[in-house]
């Protein structure tokens, strides 16, 4: 029996997909994003072990809210693609119950991506950076792993919401936005694009975990500049 490691479960989520959602945070991540606000999800040995059936039982309590609001379950992390067998199991169980499924991912894991996506209604795709050097700078890994997942997304044709964090000096240039637009143009079924402002709310977690926060000297993203970049991106995508 495949066991999953779950960091936490958040009910009544309103921003991680359509409708009212329950967000299940998987434990473990292979990236070390400079601005990660959940470093407590990194360790694969953390969290609580559950079977897919045990997790489904918890999720079914919220099904009336899903049904009334057009919501469902979003599997986030950590990185959901690091537990591919468990993810497939729980996705299948949710679909059998008529629950809308979404995965919130950086596209960096392993396993049969296409099999995962066959049981996924929506992918919330976090594009960390637009080129290999930038990807390494932010995550510690190259962009190739992300590109492999993107191919699977294209092959299946699943619906996609794009997310990209705007970080001062790292991703806030017009050149970066132009490259981002070129990536998005080549993805089918993109329903929504969000430029998320970098914030510093997670710094206290690093202090508690005795971890170095690499972006300590970078201020939170200016809201007006983010809006201008969002407008620029929209113009490029029209």
UniProtKB/Swiss-Prot annotation:
It is found in: Cytoplasm. It comes from the Bacteria. It comes from Clostridium pasteurianum. It catalyses: glycyl-[formate C-acetyltransferase] + reduced [flavodoxin] + S-adenosyl-L-methionine = glycin-2-yl radical-[formate C-acetyltransferase] + semiquinone [flavodoxin] + 5'-deoxyadenosine + L-methionine + H(+). Keywords: 4Fe-4S, Cytoplasm, Iron, Iron-sulfur, Metal-binding, Oxidoreductase, S-adenosyl-L-methionine. Residues 15-236 form the Radical SAM core domain. CDD domains: Radical_SAM. The lineage of its organism: Bacteria, Bacillati, Bacillota, Clostridia, Eubacteriales. Its EC number is 1.97.1.4. S-adenosyl-L-methionine binds at residues 35-37, 78, 126-128, 199. Activation of pyruvate formate-lyase under anaerobic conditions by generation of an organic free radical, using S-adenosylmethionine and reduced flavodoxin as cosubstrates to produce 5'-deoxy-adenosine. Transmembrane segments: none annotated. Binds 1 [4Fe-4S] cluster. The cluster is coordinated with 3 cysteines and an exchangeable S-adenosyl-L-methionine. The gene is act. The keyword Transferase does not apply. InterPro entries: Aldolase_TIM (IPR013785), Organic_radical-activating (IPR034457), PFL1_activating (IPR012838), Pyruvate_for-lyase_activase (IPR034465), Radical_activat_CS (IPR001989), rSAM (IPR007197). PANTHER family: PYRUVATE FORMATE-LYASE 1-ACTIVATING ENZYME, PYRUVATE FORMATE-LYASE-ACTIVATING ENZYME. Its cofactor is [4Fe-4S] cluster. It is an enzyme of class 1 (oxidoreductase). This is Pyruvate formate-lyase-activating enzyme. GO terms for cellular component: cytoplasm. It holds the Pfam family Fer4_12. One of its GO terms (molecular function) is 4 iron, 4 sulfur cluster binding. [4Fe-4S] cluster binds at residues 29, 33, 36. Belongs to the organic radical-activating enzymes family.
């Amino acid at each position: 029996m495949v066991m999953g490691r779950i960091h936490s479960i958040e009910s009544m989520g309103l921003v991680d997909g359509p409708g009212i959602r329950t967000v299940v945070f998987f434990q473990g991540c292979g990236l070390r994003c400079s601005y990660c606000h959940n470093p407590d999800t990194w360790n694969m040995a953390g969290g609580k072990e559950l079977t897919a059936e045990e997790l489904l039982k918890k999720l079914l309590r919220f099904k009336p809210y899903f049904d009334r609001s057009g919501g469902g379950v979003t599997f986030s992390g950590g990185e959901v693609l690091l537990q591919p067998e468990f993810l497939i199991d729980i996705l299948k169980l949710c679909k059998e119950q008529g629950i809308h499924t979404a995965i919130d991912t950086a596209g960096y894991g392993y396993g049969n991506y296409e099999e995962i996506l066959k049981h996924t209604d929506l992918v919330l795709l976090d594009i960390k950076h637009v080129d290999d050097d930038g990807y390494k700078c932010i995550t510690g890994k190259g962009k190739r792993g992300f590109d492999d997942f993107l191919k699977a997304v294209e092959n299946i044709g699943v619906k996609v919401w794009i997310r990209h964090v705007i970080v001062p000096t790292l991703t806030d240039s017009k050149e970066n936005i132009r490259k981002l637009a070129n990536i998005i143009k080549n993805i089918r079924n993109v329903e929504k694009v969000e430029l998320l402002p970098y914030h510093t709310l997670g710094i206290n977690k690093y202090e508690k975990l005795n971890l170095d926060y690499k972006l300590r000297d970078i201020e939170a993203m200016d809201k007006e500049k983010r809006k201008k970049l969002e407008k620029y991106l929209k113009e490029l995508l029209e």
